[in-house]
């Protein structure tokens, strides 16, 4: 008669049986692994012994975090500059007329600092990065366009332009800022890292977009569509990891909110088909005209204005600043700055803008760029596009929440037409307005608007990049 096992003995027997099954499964797994990947463990051991390789990866991701932090700081400074200008503008009637003196004087001051200390900071920043990505450019010229020092100079000058009340944005400049910060990582990387200046600048530029718009996906698409057309990436995995890391820094600071908050854009209905088509065509033509004006203004024409700008750059900048201030006075300050508040109010169906807002915002943004002051056109383009969508909605008899889909289409259409990047525009606007219900509508509008824009002009950024060298002399 067998003696029954004690509970402890039963547990020990079960444990031994489980251990035998585990060893058998492990052996089977190892045998299968050796058959399919005979060099697996050797490669793992080799990977773990490459200490410098892991140091390079740590440096890459560390500078990605630094890029995100710098862009976050840039965002906070830019918002502070906008609020400071609005505080000046809100000093009653005296403040409104003080702006007529404040804006031209500060515009001249920012232009003087730009021409004296950082001539490569003028303009958006995206053309500078595109030019720096040219393999035929020597190191000295590339460093003049993209460097850590240039990044901080760009931040200061753009904030100065926003403090002046000019119609400029900070999103385009973050491309140059991010590329400059990330390019500084090259001195800390080993020659075996395989990451050259091209990869670092692409990673930094796209990381800047990801952190600026709080959308890592937008940064990745921007890198693929705008920055790698001439040459691909040798280490795309680490470039994408850097973009995501910078975007995570922005999310950690500002939260997992979309650019304009949690907005719920309605799904397009068949009743909006004709107004939506009209928005796509109008934003495409208007965006192409705007891009053409920016390029022609930078290149110059044989006319009196171009001669005056070349001979008396500071007087010309003062004139542009005065015109922008007058436009702001007419619109009650709605055209000053990037246009975030106005665009958000339109998307919430709460804004009551003057009928000429879209045209005046268009002119204010063009004059701000023509003055030569550093600043981008991303956010102003969104505001102009939102205005076009709102105007067409009004002409179609729509208002309030019913107009929101057309406003979103106007944003994506004008941005795609201006920048020449329909996929980037579609992704950014979709993430900014949480418009996943309008995915196909936004994509179709971006592609159609971009096609109409190409009837008027070539890529604005490529045209501006071709004008960068020789660099202007310091004065």
Kindly give the residue locations of the regions a language model identified.
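Alpha-helical transmembrane segments and immediately membrane-proximal extracytoplasmic
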Residues: 1-475
């Amino acid at each position: 008669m067998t003696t029954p096992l004690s509970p402890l003995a039963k547990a020990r027997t079960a444990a031994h049986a489980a251990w035998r099954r585990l060893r058998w499964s492990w052996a089977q797994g190892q045998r299968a692994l050796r058959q399919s990947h005979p060099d697996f463990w050797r490669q793992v051991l080799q990977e773990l012994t490459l200490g410098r390789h892991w140091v390079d990866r740590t440096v890459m991701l560390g500078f990605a975090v630094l890029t995100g932090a710098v862009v976050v700081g840039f965002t906070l400074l830019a918002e502070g500059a906008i609020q400071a200008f609005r505080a000046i503008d809100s000093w009653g009637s005296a403040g409104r007329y003080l702006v007529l003196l404040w804006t031209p004087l500060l515009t001249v001051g920012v232009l003087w600092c730009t021409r004296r200390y950082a001539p490569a900071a003028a303009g958006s920043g995206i053309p500078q990065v595109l030019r720096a990505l040219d393999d035929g450019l020597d190191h000295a010229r590339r460093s003049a366009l993209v460097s850590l020092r240039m990044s901080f100079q760009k931040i200061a000058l753009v904030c100065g332009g926003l403090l002046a009340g000019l119609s400029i944005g900070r999103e385009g400049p973050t491309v140059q800022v991010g590329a400059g910060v990330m390019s500084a990582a090259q001195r800390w990387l080993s020659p075996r890292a395989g990451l050259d200046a091209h990869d670092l600048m692409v990673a930094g530029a796209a990381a800047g977009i990801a952190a600026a718009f709080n959308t890592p996906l937008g940064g990745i698409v921007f890198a693929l569509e705008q920055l790698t057309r001439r040459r691909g990436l040798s280490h795309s995995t680490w470039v994408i990891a850097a973009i995501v890391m910078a975007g995570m820094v922005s999310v950690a600071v500002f939260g997992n909110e979309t650019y304009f908050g949690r907005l719920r854009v309605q799904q397009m209905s068949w009743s909006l088909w004709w107004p939506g088509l009209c928005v796509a065509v109008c934003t495409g033509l208007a965006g192409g005209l705007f891009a053409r004006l920016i390029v022609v203004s930078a290149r110059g024409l044989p006319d009196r204005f171009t001669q005056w700008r070349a001979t008396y750059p500071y007087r010309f900048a003062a004139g542009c600043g005065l015109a922008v201030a007058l436009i702001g006075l007419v619109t009650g300050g709605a055209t000053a700055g990037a246009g975030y508040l106005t665009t958000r109010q339109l998307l919430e169906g709460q804004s009551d803008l003057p009928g000429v807002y879209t045209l005046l915002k268009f002119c204010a943004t063009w004059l701000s760029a023509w003055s030569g002051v550093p600043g981008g056109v991303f956010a102003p383009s969104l505001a102009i596009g939102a205005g076009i969508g709102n105007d067409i909605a009004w002409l179609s008899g729509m208002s309030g929440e019913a107009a929101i889909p057309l406003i979103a289409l106007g944003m994506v259409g004008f941005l795609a037409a201006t920048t020449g990047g329909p996929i980037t525009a579609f992704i950014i606007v979709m993430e900014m307005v949480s418009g996943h219900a309008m995915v196909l509508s936004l994509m179709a509008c971006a592609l159609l608007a971009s096609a109409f824009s190409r009837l008027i002009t070539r890529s604005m950024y490529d045209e501006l990049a071709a004008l960068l060298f020789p660099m202007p002399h310091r004065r």
